[in-house]
């Protein structure tokens, strides 16, 4: 562990960071092989399928879907923005074991550095992934970061939701989802959001709302496909 991390985290936190990522990786590497992903999409939308390399765009989803998203996209070579908090460090170490790279930053800390890191990924032809309401909510409310990245890079914003048929739902701000073994997971894609590179300052909020609406349509469609009532 680097000297900077020794200063940032307590002894207990450092022990957690040393042990927990490998346990989580082992458990969900096994459990993830039992999950059955079913992809649906709005008319005219070409989704990114499990096992294929993603395209040159920005994908957005709600923070509660991190675990199923990690398994679904593990072959995509995507780069994800993770906060600089302790929780972010923990998630980063888990994602590295699944083969991801992470850019550190968030809407609350290191945001500019994070956006520039993701822009570099997009400039190199890669895929960027955003937890749209992370790192601390409020739930189901998109932050401005994805829209700013789309405006900087000229790349479109994809909106999707992963809804397990059977899952444990944690009592956290995001109602974090842990899919149960052998469950079906619906991957629901909505229409893309295009953001002009010359978007004026007074146009950002409308684009944020457009992306938020797409994410909520994707979530509602997944719930309906499973016969669930939207929470």
Briefly describe each language-model feature range.
Residues 3, 141-201:
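A cross-family acyltransferase "interaction/gating" segment
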Residues 56-109, 153, 169:
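Catalytic core of membrane glycerolipid acyltransferases/transacylases, capturing the structured
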Residues 105, 131, 159-162:
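Generic beta-sheet signal
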Residues 108-112, 139:
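A conditional alpha-helix N-cap/helix-loop micro-motif detector
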Residues 117-153:
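Catalytic-site beta-strand/loop segments enriched in glycine and acidic/polar residues
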């Amino acid at each position: 562990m680097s000297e900077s991390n020794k200063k940032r985290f307590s002894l207990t936190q450092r022990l957690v960071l040393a042990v927990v990522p490998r346990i989580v990786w082992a458990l969900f590497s096994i459990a993830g092989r039992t999950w059955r992903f079913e992809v649906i999409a709005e008319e005219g939308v070409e989704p990114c399928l499990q096992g294929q390399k993603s395209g040159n765009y920005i994908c957005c989803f709600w923070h509660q879907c991190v675990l199923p998203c990690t398994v679904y996209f593990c072959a995509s070579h995507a780069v994800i923005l993770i906060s600089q908090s302790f929780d972010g460090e923990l998630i980063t170490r888990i994602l590295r074991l699944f083969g991801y790279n992470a850019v550190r930053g968030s809407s609350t800390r290191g945001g500019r550095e994070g956006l520039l890191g993701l822009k570099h990924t997009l400039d190199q032809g890669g895929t960027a992934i955003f937890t749209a309401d992370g790192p601390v909510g409020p739930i189901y409310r998109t932050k401005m970061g994805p829209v700013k990245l789309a405006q900087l890079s000229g790349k479109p914003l994809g909106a999707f939701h992963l809804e397990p048929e059977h899952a444990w739902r944690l009592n956290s701000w995001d109602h974090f989802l842990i899919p149960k073994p052998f469950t079906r997971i619906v991957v629901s894609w909505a229409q893309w959001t295009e953001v002009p590179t010359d978007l004026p300052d007074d146009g950002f909020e409308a684009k944020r709302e457009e992306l938020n609406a797409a994410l909520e349509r994707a979530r509602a469609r997944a719930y309906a496909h499973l016969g669930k009532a939207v929470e």
